[in-house]
Amino acid sequence: MGNKRRTIYTMSLKNYINKMSTHSKFINSTLSYWKIEKQKGSKGEQIVRNFLTNHNVKFKEQKTFHNLYYKDKNHLLRFDFQIFFKDSWFLLELQGQQHYKPTNFGGHLTEQEIQQNFEEGQERDRMKKEYCSKHNIILKCVDWNGNPKTLIKDLQEMFRNL
């Protein structure tokens, strides 16, 4: 899951409300705050979720299949999104840098742990691709390099070509 950003407020709620020029600004800013705070997943997943919602595309997040698991049945593999489009559906996976090279996001892992995580991730990716191929499921993989504009452009291009 993505990192949650916490903000420490130094102003009381009463002062915050009083600083707002209108009641609607207060309501809108509060709703906006909670919408962002409640979103789950990585930043890339949030961008995809917002893109799909804004384009009225139906989707399900963290799609699993009962017969696709890693190591044992308690570790079902998840696809980022199941997208319903044009009387059909397909799966979408975001592919960040950890899918292509060993990555130490937290900075606290040993080289051996980094390599093991990478190899396990590669195995899970292979299993997902194999499962989709075997079951005639369309799997779209979109690179996520941390640039929201690039991701949105890639999503637009993907939908144009469907």
Task: Explain the meaning of each model-derived region.
Residues 2-162:
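Nucleic-acid endo/exonuclease domains
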